Amino acid sequence: MIAVITTLLTYYMSSNNLITLLIAIEILLLTVTLKLIHISGYYDDIYGTIFSLIIIILAGAESAIGLSILVAYYRLRGTIGHSI
């Protein structure tokens, strides 16, 4: 719950910066993954840990793709801001 509130607060405080929005989404995904690791360790379940590892790998690929899209957007427009 705290991760969702923190992510929404970060988005509200910097709503015109796409890089900060990408970082806020990654923090939310990492928080959910860490909670999944904690729960799978509590119940002694290996599948939750494996699933968490897959989520972390996919999050790394997602952030690399998102950052490359932002770099291409910056080269095209000259700014990284957006408007709601």
UniProtKB/Swiss-Prot annotation:
Localisation per UniProt entry: Mitochondrion membrane
Keyword entries, A-Z: Electron transport, Membrane, Mitochondrion, NAD, Respiratory chain, Translocase, Transmembrane, Transmembrane helix, Transport, Ubiquinone
Any single Pfam family the record assigns to this protein: Oxidored_q2
Biological processes, Gene Ontology terms: mitochondrial electron transport, NADH to ubiquinone
Membrane topology of the entry: Multi-pass membrane protein
Molecular function terms, GO-annotated: NADH dehydrogenase (ubiquinone) activity
Catalyzed reaction equations: a ubiquinone + NADH + 5 H(+)(in) = a ubiquinol + NAD(+) + 4 H(+)(out)
Domain of life of the organism encoding this protein: Eukaryota
A single cellular component GO annotation: respiratory chain complex I
Broad class of enzyme this protein falls into: translocase
Transmembrane segments: 19-39, 50-70
Enzyme Commission number(s) from the entry: 7.1.1.2
InterPro entries tied to this protein: NADH_UbQ_OxRdtase_chain4L/K, NUOK/Mnh_C1-like
Similarity annotation: Belongs to the complex I subunit 4L family.
Protein task: Core subunit of the mitochondrial membrane respiratory chain NADH dehydrogenase (Complex I) that is believed to belong to the minimal assembly required for catalysis. Complex I functions in the transfer of electrons from NADH to the respiratory chain. The immediate electron acceptor for the enzyme is believed to be ubiquinone.
PANTHER family (UniProt xref): NADH-UBIQUINONE OXIDOREDUCTASE CHAIN 4L, NADH-UBIQUINONE OXIDOREDUCTASE SUBUNIT ND4L
Protein name: NADH-ubiquinone oxidoreductase chain 4L
Organism expressing this protein natively: Candida albicans (strain SC5314 / ATCC MYA-2876)
Gene: NAD4L
